[in-house]
A protein has these predicted regions:
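A glycine-rich, basic-preceded beta-loop-alpha segment at the flavin cofactor/substrate interface
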Residues: 240-245, 249, 254, 261-292, ...
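A short core secondary-structure module
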Residues: 195, 199-245
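C-terminal helix-coil-helix/basic helical segment that borders enzyme active sites and/or dimer interfaces
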Residues: 343-380, 396, 480-493, 512-527
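C-terminal amphipathic alpha-helical interaction region
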Residues: 452-574
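C-terminal catalytic subdomain
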Residues: 416, 420-458, 499-516
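Extended, charge-enriched "interface" segments that sit outside catalytic cores
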Residues: 1-106, 568-574
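Internal maturation/activation junctions in enzymes
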Residues: 145-194, 350-369, 376, 387, ...
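Internal helix-loop-helix
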Residues: 73-164, 206-210, 342, 346, ...
């Protein structure tokens, strides 16, 4: 068959992503930017070349579980391909984790790190996933770890030397527990020598080749529920080539992230050490979750940016109706909408990274610390929804080619679906956002930030956008105030709409700040940022207003469960 169409090509991912570049330029001081930007451009070239080729190879050669050796001994060895292992080495070389702990640029180190992560992730075949947990474990050991762990383990988790670099797992999900971690069944028994032995099942572990892990378990005799859980550190045995008290039951056959080994594990007397106080496992491991959720947001924004880059390039190559797609007004509208969503996701992510950096360096105000607590679930849940809708639109931009596996585009969509699931689903995070808003301090801090952003007046075109943000914020704050006085069911029922509305309203305000900042240099050069802010703010009118009525009233329940209460019968379990 004759050749008929050029496929999309990927250029330097730093040079080609204006929204990312300008966001980072606004947040970093000029002297820091001058130091790090050349290296970001170099990484952007590496991501589009060497790393992309490795990622394609890793996707084609997924991990395998070898249960037995040639002599029948059970070894439970997970084999990954050379390309996957090389991507891990590149992460160490590029300091994707290390930068946050070297803190060469103080409070700005997290922004620098997240810029690197946004470039690294889309060409990593999800090697970024173990990095998220490694970063979270490093911070947890930095805060809560005993001196021996800080001296022996922490340097490996933040090393730039591929030979010394270790990754860490975060094993929380169990068959019964899931998001309800208080239902976890793993038990910790004293080993008689000051340590512990863990026994239980971990149903979903995504860093199964990690050298170390943090996990939750219930000490013998501890009370039921989350308050009975403690956090433990363990060495898997991977560093020595053989698992210690761990059986790999199977690798998961997943919708996406297929290069990433994900497994069900059985813990059978695994040696472990408690980290933090007994019964404080959930608050202690929250340090990991706060970081992995922001990684999730950054990787979601990066994935959306990758899809947008491919769609933009294809629009210049593909001709339809006698013209390139890039000259068709309706296609340009579609791409512009995607670009606005991508810019919004970046703004949310990097504002959270900025807050995290300030908190870690001890310079955050009390209000900023409260804001970070609310930002973490808001940013994760908002970007998780954005990337699924956005990448679905990207696939559609390619027509039938987007539905063909060997273009690689269906894999982009499959992978995107993980972002609203990993590290807490939308509903779980919406409830967490409600908890963060309890007491009013965090919500008041966010309200002040958004209100401050809409006070700008330098760009006349943004006046309608500022009004839209003010109106949406007022509605959301008013709903929260009223619902907080109502029954708990009403507050929970509206949590999703409230959190998504708040996240998108915040994103719109950040886009306004970005556009105003760019316009100070040149209104003409700021045109893309102004248009992104204008377009995104226009979507706020479509945000559902949270319902104040309790679903227990009946109608919501009947609709949700498929009939009147007396008609709904659960199927018998067999």
């Amino acid at each position: 068959m004759a050749f008929f169409q050029d496929g999309p090509e990927l250029g330097n991912t730093w040079a080609g992503d204006r929204a990312l570049r300008e966001c980072v330029r606004r947040l970093l001081p000029s002297e820091v930017l001058a130091e790090v930007e050349p290296d970001l451009e170099r990484l952007g070239e590496r991501a589009a070349g060497e790393m992309l080729a490795l990622a394609v190879e890793a996707e084609r050669d997924p991990p395998r579980l070898v249960r037995l050796d040639a002599w029948g001994r059970r070894v439970d060895r997970i084999e990954t391909c050379p390309a996957w292992r090389r991507l891990h080495e590149i992460a160490a070389e590029e300091g994707v984790v290390a930068i946050a702990y070297e803190r060469a640029h103080g409070e700005h180190s997290r922004v620098h790190q997240f810029a690197r992560l946004a470039l690294y992730h889309p060409s990593s075949a999800f090697a970024s996933c173990p990095l998220a947990m490694t970063d979270g474990a490093a911070r947890t050991l930095e805060i809560h770890g005993e001196e021996e762990l800080r001296e022996r383990i922490l340097p490996r988790l933040i090393s730039r030397d591929p030979e010394a670099f270790w990754t860490a797992g975060q094993w929380m999900t169990e068959r019964t527990g899931g998001s309800d971690v208080g239902d976890s069944e793993t038990v910790a028994a004293p080993d008689g020598a000051g340590g512990w032995r863990l026994t239980g099942s971990k149903w979903f572990t995504s860093a199964t080749t990690a050298e170390v892990a943090l996990t939750l378990a219930r000490c013998e005799g501890a009370p039921a529920g989350s308050r009975g859980l403690s956090m433990f550190f363990l060495e898997t045995g991977m560093a020595a080539g053989a698992l210690r008290g761990i059986r790999v039951e199977r690798l998961k056959d997943k919708l996406g992230t297929r290069a990433l080994p994900t497994a069900e594990l059985e813990l059978d007397g695994v040696p472990a050490r408690m980290v933090g106080e007994p019964g404080r496992g959930v608050p202690t491991i929250a340090t990991v979750l706060n970081i992995t959720r922001l990684y999730n947001a950054c990787c979601a924004a990066g994935t959306l940016g990758r899809g947008l880059a491919l769609a933009r390039d294809y629009a210049r190559r593909r001709r339809a109706f006698g013209r390139p797609l890039a000259e068709l007004p309706l296609h340009l509208e579609t791409l512009a909408g995607l670009a606005a969503e991508h810019a919004a996701a970046l703004q949310l992510t990097f504002r959270a990274a900025q807050l995290l950096g300030r908190e870690e360096c001890g310079v955050a105000s009390a209000g900023e610390r409260e804001l970070l607590r609310l930002a973490t679930p808001l940013v994760k849940l908002t970007t998780g929804r954005q990337v699924v809708a956005g990448v679905s639109e990207v696939v559609e931009c390619f027509g039938g080619a987007g539905y063909v596996e060997d273009t690689g585009l269906p894999g982009l969509l499959r992978d995107a679906q993980v972002f609203p699931i990993w590290e807490g689903t939308t509903n779980v995070l919406a409830l967490d956002a409600l908890r963060a808003a309890r007491g009013g301090g965090a919500l008041a801090a966010l309200e002040r930030e958004i209100s401050g952003a809409v006070e700008g007046s330098g760009v006349a075109l943004l006046a309608p956008a500022r009004s839209a943000v003010r109106e949406c914020l007022a509605q959301l704050v008013a709903w929260h105030s009223l619902a907080s006085r109502d029954a708990r069911e009403a507050l929970e029922a509206g949590a999703r709409d409230f959190s998504l509305g708040l996240g998108r309203t915040w994103a719109a305000s950040l886009l306004l700040s970005q556009a105003e900042w760019e316009a100070r240099g040149s209104e003409r050069a700021a045109a893309p940022a102004v248009e992104a802010a204008r377009r995104f703010a226009a979507t706020l009118g479509a945000i559902p207003v949270p319902r104040a009525a309790s679903p227990g009233a009946g109608a919501t329940r009947d609709l949700a469960l498929g009939g009147a209460a007396e008609e709904v019968r659960a199927p018998a379990l067999r």
